[in-house]
Amino acid sequence: MSSTRHSYSSGGSGKSKHGRRIAQTSADAKLYAAYEESSESGSFDYSQSVSAGKEGISSQLVTAYLQRMQRGGLVQQFGCLIAVEEETFRVLAYGANAPEMLDVATQAVPTMGQYSRLCIGADVRTLLSPASASALDRVIGVVDVSMFNPITVQSRSSGKPFYAILHRNDVGLVIDLEPIRPDDASITGGALQSHKLAAKAIARLQSLPGGDIGLLCDSVVEEVHELTGFDRVMAYKFHEDEHGEVVAEIRRTDLEPYIGLHYPATDIPQAARFLFMKNRVRMICDCRLPPVKLIQDKTLSQPMSLTGSKLRAPHGCHTQYMANMNSISSLVMAVIVNDSDDDSPGHSSQGIKLWGLVVCHHTSPRYVPFPVRSACEFLMQVFSLQLNMEVGMAAQVREKHILRTQTLLCDMLLRDAPIGIVSQSPNIMDLVTCDGAALYYGKKCWLLGTTPTEAQIVDIAAWLLDCHKDSTGLSTDSLAKTGYPEASCLGDAVCGLAAAKITATDFLFWFRSHTAKEVRWGGARHDPEERDDGRRMHPRSSFKAFLEVVKQQSLPWEDVEMDAIHSLQLILRGSFQDIDDSNTKTMIHARLNDLKLQGLDELSTVASEMVRLIETATAPILAVDGQGLINGWNGKVAELTGLSFETAMGKSLAKELVHEESKTIVERVLHLALEGEEEQDIEIHLRTYDQHKQKGVVILIVNTCCSRDVSNNVVGVCFVGQDVTGQKLVLDRFIRIQGDYKAIVQSLNPLIPPIFGADEYGFCSEWNAAMEKLSNWRREEVLGKMLVGEIFGLQMVCCRLQGQDVVTKLMIVLNDAVNGQESEKFPLVFYDRNGRRVEALLIASKRTDADGRITGVFCFLHTASPELLQALIIKRAKEKVDKELSYVKEELKKPLEGLAFTRTVLEGTNLTIEQRQLIKTNAWCERQLRKILEDDLNNIEEGYMDLEMSEFFMGSVIDAVISQGMAASRGKGVQILTEIPNDVKLMCLFGDQARLQQVLADLLFCAINHATTTNEDEKDWVTIKVSRTKTRLDDGVHLMHFEFRISHSGQGISEALVEEMTNKSQKWTPEGLAISISCTLIRLMNGDVKYTTDAGNKCFLVTIQFPLAHRDDATSVR
């Protein structure tokens, strides 16, 4: 599809995104040039400059702008900068305030041998104490010097302490020196020590429930506020079109709220965003203080790059912006996430992008010590990890929705109903986010939502055929800017358009309205009458500038949306070409049958392959039948135990093969598994044999898996395990010798697992023989190196990790251990000295001295089989789902209480009979919901459930069931009919009313969802029919036998859903799971449910019996 792109529109490809950034950089340079050219700040008109950003600008001005941003030659006053030649520490540049801050004098030309003064060419180590000089020597040759930051140094002349923050640039090593103040937290050095300050904040972020990016953003601004103490902390997100929005905020109560504000892309220039990617935390202590000039060696060919410096001075344009906001100091942290659509030249794999910023403002000067800033930076890395997961999950949900909608739309086409994609539900509006959609086919229009008139759609189609005749469609966020001549007639209701050509003259259209309706001025009311100085760079002015920029423009079409439209277009073009072919349907069904036969062959092949995989798996796998006798014994478990497959077959696992101490555990696990309850992380001890004689023991951690027959009955148990014999023996010996670990760590025993350790500053202190063998790095080569940064890292390290996310996760594990928290098994993947991929599970534990003080961390590795890793992933996923479900259940109880209170109040008012009946129906629906919230799904599936028996009228049940289906039926245009005798409604019965309601409501919903006819002249319908017979028991009780027939129009539910209903499926859809549970509930109430045909129509047939609430002698049966 062709695509028209403008400022503030979504790129349809990587190239358009890259081009948009280049264009935005030009707009930034234009704004910068306008500011520089103004003789005084009052002559700078901000809002006019934003508009003027659309005009062209020379490449020389853009280059000058970028040069000024990165090589401005100015630094802030809260520290001093010294740049040196790395090998010799010869000074190449320094800030004009450095001599005073270091308490040394300057000397233009040093005398022979005298370098105790600061000047170009001096050895910077002569200005520092001997210990400080040694600390600087330590970093020479280290690839990632940031892991050593901050290094604590002292001035030789005065003893004044400083944090030295190091980075490299194009000329050498840059040292930012920040004075350590008396009230600063005591941090002696290294990133690991700084990260401890964020331990509580990190724990909170990791404990948050998934699926709520808003809560995540709210939490991170609260934690940063607590760490830094700034008056205002905001989370600022960049949208696809480069403009920004404040999505979370915490502030001092007397400050104006900025939550919900949108800002033009020029407010945070592209050059500044690039700098944030390189230097992820930026502090401005006092925007009113003049910057300090940088003095540099005249032999340097250009001004020195300050991209990575913590002291780089802000541009005057930005300081004025801050002053206008009454923000004297600021702290800004970059939030960087993965970017699968990274389009930068030379990027072939997944890149990274700037998702947004966490911005702190203060109304007075404020300094935040570097260790706290480092902790904040680490917190941002954890925040980015969480964001990656949330964005990924949201994308998956969205893609699944699109695929499901596409499938349903294609299903309509297979049933020869092409017009159904606009006349039925779901329809084409459900495919992507839009305000309206239309099908233009055969010179007729079908309209959905907010659209142009039929005449206007015909005109748009003609314009496309005339002006874009060579393309298969068009997408734009502004019809006016695309050149459509009648765009002004459409108004704000229709601004954006995505069009897909499906035949030579026919189109599908999706429409979007004006962006401004999506933009809200949050917090304080934005009064249109309130006028501020539009020429000043103030948030309100910025907001007005944004509204002007997005005039006659919609939200951009995202790449995933255009992919979905294009996919549907390809399907429809083929379908519409074949629409008159009478053999099309026959051909389709024949192809489907071929696919089914092919699927059976593939299933057989997969089954054979699974058997082979189990036999050759690197994990020990064994299986038993219903009597606990071995019927599966793979090669790995035979190797570990010394017992061959033939010898093990038929032996009793509990009585003959496990060690005596594991016998009770195995018997219990077998009993539970045969009852259908699977266990995880069970430790069992198997006997080992040497030529069939018992020799020793092998320790396995196993997960059990029930083996079932075609009827879903448990017929055996499979054990998938991991050999932890070596690790277990090591841990036991650690306990026995109470800390005398050297004999174990440095042992050559092959049973000892790989072990490495670090001191409290993050330097490697242990690297045992097994770790040498695993990594191919000798102990003496790694001891004393920084564990993360020199040994494990991304570039020029001993053991390369896969991406920044893995580095961050490893740092989290080590940080938890140093803070005394035991870590779970962390899947660690790295590449050894020879480039071989190593997969292992890491357990990190604190290391303490004799007084119990934490002195470092110990890490145990054991190589993990794919089977165990998969089991661990599945377990964590299940735990996460269970946690989220518990949260939802708990949160639903509160609004339920509110509904109950409202109902109670209404019951005490003067109501008509009909109104009272509605209140009663509401009460029973509420009771049903409470029952569902209290359900334990596992208990229901296993047949354990307490029924709440009480008297009820069948009429109340019918009313409650129909009320639950009315909204869905009206939305889908389905008519609900009933055939229920009046005497049935008046029957007073004894049973569980809420459960009966739940079952019938689920079946009714399913019937409504599938009540679709292919004949447009027929109305879709669902019929509820109830019949009964009566039996008298010996004790005078009458038993009523009921048949509920819920029939519906259409071809019926799918075979897959029928399989889910009868528990024959291995995977459940939400609808299938609900129906399956309802069938289980009916059987637990001694009833039955079938899906059958009644008088030519598909229907659910429910048979169940209830006693009448009164005997013949009028005595209650309760």
Curated annotation (Swiss-Prot):
Biased composition (Low complexity): 1-10
Domain annotation PAS: ranges: 606-677, 740-811
Gene Ontology biological process terms, A to Z: detection of visible light; red, far-red light phototransduction; regulation of DNA-templated transcription
Recorded GO MF terms: photoreceptor activity; protein homodimerization activity
Keyword Amino-acid biosynthesis: no
UniProt region (Disordered), positions on chain: 1-23
Keyword Repeat: yes
InterPro entries xref list: GAF, GAF-like_dom_sf, HATPase_C_sf, His_kinase_dom, PAS, PAS-like_dom_sf, PAS_2, PAS_fold
Cross-referenced SUPFAM superfamilies: ATPase domain of HSP90 chaperone/DNA topoisomerase II/histidine kinase (SSF55874), GAF domain-like (SSF55781), PYP-like sensor domain (PAS domain) (SSF55785)
Post-translational modification: Contains one covalently linked phytochromobilin chromophore.
Residues the entry annotates as binding phytochromobilin: C317
Domain Histidine kinase: residue ranges: 887-1110
Subunit structure: Homodimer.
Chain's role: Regulatory photoreceptor which exists in two forms that are reversibly interconvertible by light: the Pr form that absorbs maximally in the red region of the spectrum and the Pfr form that absorbs maximally in the far-red region. Photoconversion of Pr to Pfr induces an array of morphogenic responses, whereas reconversion of Pfr to Pr cancels the induction of those responses. Pfr controls the expression of a number of nuclear genes including those encoding the small subunit of ribulose-bisphosphate carboxylase, chlorophyll A/B binding protein, protochlorophyllide reductase, rRNA, etc.
PANTHER family: OS08G0260000 PROTEIN, PHYTOCHROME 1
Record's protein name: Phytochrome 1
Species, as recorded: Adiantum capillus-veneris (Maidenhair fern)
Native organism taxonomy: Eukaryota, Viridiplantae, Streptophyta, Embryophyta, Tracheophyta
